[in-house]
């Protein structure tokens, strides 16, 4: 059976979290520091990606996470800011990034996942349907 997780995010902060297994651990992780309650990474990967279709397990998170959509709680990657490499925590924050002592990835992708965003006027905008990008 799949483990179920739910997070309520308001004003870019996780305000509530539930898990069918490991909820106590999840809540302790969220209490690590203020940045632990914010997303540090969101990666949308279609279920049909070559790595996903390979069926291989590399036993290395940096490779395996690319087989599925995933999110990370905590620290963002400062190298993702255009033209920047070694930013301080305050510089990361000034650019809208998140600082934390943790960075915990978890895979959320599958051929069943639907992902929606919200437009400027609050309308729901489909992004993924059944694990694939919406055209």
Predicted regions and their residues:
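Single conserved hydrophobic/aromatic residue that forms the stacking wall/gate
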Residues: 1-8
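Broad gene-expression machinery/nucleic-acid interaction feature
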Residues: 4, 68, 112
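Dual-mode signal for accessory low-complexity, basic/Gly-rich regions
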Residues: 15-85
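Extended hydrophobic packing segments that form well-structured cores
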Residues: 93-135
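A general structural signal for short secondary-structure junctions and capping/turn motifs
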Residues: 6, 32-34, 60-63, 105-108, ...
